[in-house]
Regions:
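Conserved small-residue
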Residues: 26-28, 33, 88, 115, ...
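A generic structural motif
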Residues: 42-43, 113, 316
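Active-site core segments that coordinate phosphate-bearing ligands/cofactors
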Residues: 2-11, 15-16, 82, 120-176, ...
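Conserved beta-strand -> loop -> alpha-helix junction used to position metal-binding or nucleic-acid-contacting
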Residues: 110-120
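Short glycine/proline- and acidic residue-enriched helix-loop micro-motifs
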Residues: 52, 126-130, 218
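N-terminal glycine/serine-rich phosphate-binding loop of ATP-dependent small-molecule kinases
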Residues: 1-108, 155, 216, 238, ...
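Short beta-strand-loop/turn "lid" adjacent to the catalytic site in phosphate-handling enzymes
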Residues: 75-112, 132-134, 167-179, 183-188, ...
């Protein structure tokens, strides 16, 4: 403890703060990248005038509260007041729209990534760029404002993301980490800057509007992990820590998006690696060696914090339906007086699934609680379908629900591995699906025919990843790549447990997917008719 106290007192600890959609979390780490203190603040987005937003007051109250909570925990645990830090990094939900005038005034309410009012803009930009521009991207929000003839657009001097905004207020620097920037506007993998050809196409598209700005002039400057990104100003220090204890002059690393910090926290920034987050919703990130050959609207393209191209597949649904079935069986157990806790219930039912037939005996299920753009399903309609010949056993039933939870991810991953020939060495799995040891991991390995690794701990997630990026900026050796730094200095011997795909399981999952694809019309009819 005295050692940690010295580290904090001498300003050698590193701080990462991440704005998630429901929680703002601050994580302080030591020189060995171990979390030594944390603090958090819970917040909720508001739905106002047809848009999802957070107010500036919410943002600043939340930031100060999460920092205060962390600083108080440090005081309580180690008896020391934080005055100096080795470096600070801010990260947040990506995409969305924050536009400011030349005085630094917010011109329109902050639009978060959740807003899907940008359909027309997205459609036009996909056609123009021949590159996927999802609804939540900042450039789609900007162009939708132009299409809607919004009065404020002519006055824009700067637009950025939430992390970029906080960083600007802390340092005065209008910069953004490449990972977060890649969710604003497409990035050129070679220059690690906005794609120049697309910049010119966009300027030409809007030239008739006669705005006093060109798009690159209002976007933040792109930086990569390890770059210096500014110094905490006196004003910034007071905004972060109103007590006045925190001193100005602390270096800041480039602000990043939550996708990038998640990749850092799971050691998945090197090319040919991938990570899959499997909780309430699922997403997979695959780090590519080269750009994809074709345009696929199912795949979002972003980058790692050091600028490698990443293909992202997102599924709106995840373990919600699985949890509902486990709860139903728990209710039955309670009804007959059986004393079974939830951990035992999950363990029993998930492990039972491994006893089932590799193709689930013909049982088909869908766990959609929300619509799925990738499979063209508009609403949530959880469903189980079987024929009289189906082998209707508990093992097959549970296996089909584990299989279907990964269905959308499988469709997207097949586009990458089968259509595009993308090669993946290992996938790192994290999230609720992997809590029951070995089960979700085996199902995923068979589904995507790739070895899956699960770490014993996933650290502190995104804010921990952001603190690591802050430390990397200060500590990296000359020319040391982020992937090497993570492998050698952060994760070291923590290789996790690995499960390889099993040929019978792979064939069984492929057979299940044939039925899954055929049954999608039934799911769509349920959306239309029920």
């Amino acid at each position: 403890m005295s050692n940690i106290k010295e580290i904090i007192e001498s300003g050698k600890a590193f701080l990462g703060i991440e704005f998630g959609s429901t929680r703002i979390k601050a994580v302080l780490i030591d020189e060995e990248h171990n979390p030594i203190a944390s603090g958090s603040h819970t917040w909720e987005n508001r739905y106002e005038n047809g848009l999802w937003t957070y107010s500036l007051d919410d943002i600043w109250t939340g930031l100060q509260d999460s920092y205060r909570d962390m600083a108080e925990n440090v005081q309580k645990e180690y008896g020391v007041t934080i005055k100096k830090l080795g470096a600070i990094g801010f990260s947040a939900m990506m995409h969305g729209y924050m536009a400011f005038d030349k005085e630094g005034k917010l011109l329109a309410p902050f639009q978060t990534w959740r807003n899907s009012n940008t359909g027309k803009a997205s459609e036009v930009l996909v056609d123009l760029f021949r590159y996927n521009i999802p609804l939540r991207w900042s450039i789609a929000h900007l162009y939708q404002c132009i299409l809607d003839k919004e009065e404020h657009v002519k006055d824009i001097a700067f637009m950025t993301t939430l992390a970029g905004y906080i960083h600007w207020q802390m340092t005065g620097e209008k910069v953004l980490g490449v990972g977060d920037a890649s969710g604003m506007f497409p990035i050129d993998m070679n220059t690690k800057d906005y794609d120049e050809e697309m910049i010119q196409k966009f300027d030409k598209l809007i030239e008739g509007e006669n705005y006093p700005w060109k798009v690159k002039e209002i976007l933040p400057k792109v930086l990569v992990a390890g770059d210096a990104a500014g110094i905490l100003t006196e004003e910034g220090a007071k905004k972060l820590d109103p007590t006045g204890n925190l001193e100005a002059g602390i270096p800041l690393c480039p602000p990043e998006g939550d996708a990038g910090t998640g990749m850092v926290a799971t050691n998945s920034v090197a090319q040919r690696t991938s990570n899959i987050s499997a909780g309430t919703s699922f997403f997979s990130m695959v780090v590519l060696e080269k750009p994809l050959k074709d345009l696929h609207t199912e795949i979002d393209m972003v980058t790692t914090p050091d600028g490698s191209l990443v293909a992202m597949v997102h599924s709106n649904n995840g373990t919600t339906d699985l949890n509902a079935w486990v709860n139903l069986f728990k209710e039955f157990a309670d009804s007959i007086g059986a004393d079974v806790d939830m951990n035992q219930m999950y363990g029993t039912l998930y492990n039972k699934a491994l006893e089932g037939d590799a193709d689930c005996g013909g049982i088909l299920s869908y766990g959609n609680y929300a619509g799925e753009p990738i499979t063209n399903v508009e609403k949530g309609r959880p469903m189980v379908v079987r024929t009289p010949e189906t082998k209707f056993t508990l093992a097959n039933f549970m296996r089909s629900h584990l299989y279907t939870a990964l269905g959308v991810i499988k469709v997207g991953m097949d586009i990458l591995t089968k259509d595009e020939g993308v090669e993946i060495d290992t996938v790192l799995g994290h999230g609720g699906l992997f809590k029951t040891k070995g089960v979700g991991q085996k199902v995923l390995a068979d589904a995507i025919n790739t070895p899956v690794v699960v770490m014993e701990t996933a650290g502190e997630g995104g804010p921990w990843g952001m603190a690591i990026l802050a430390e990397y900026m200060v500590k990296r050796a000359e020319g040391e790549k982020l992937g090497d730094y993570l492998k050698n200095k952060v994760f070291g011997s923590n290789a996790g447990s690995r499960i390889d795909p099993d040929p019978e399981g792979v064939a069984g999952y492929e057979a299940f997917m044939e039925t899954y694809k055929k049954g999608l019309d039934v799911e769509r009819r349920a959306c239309a008719d029920l």
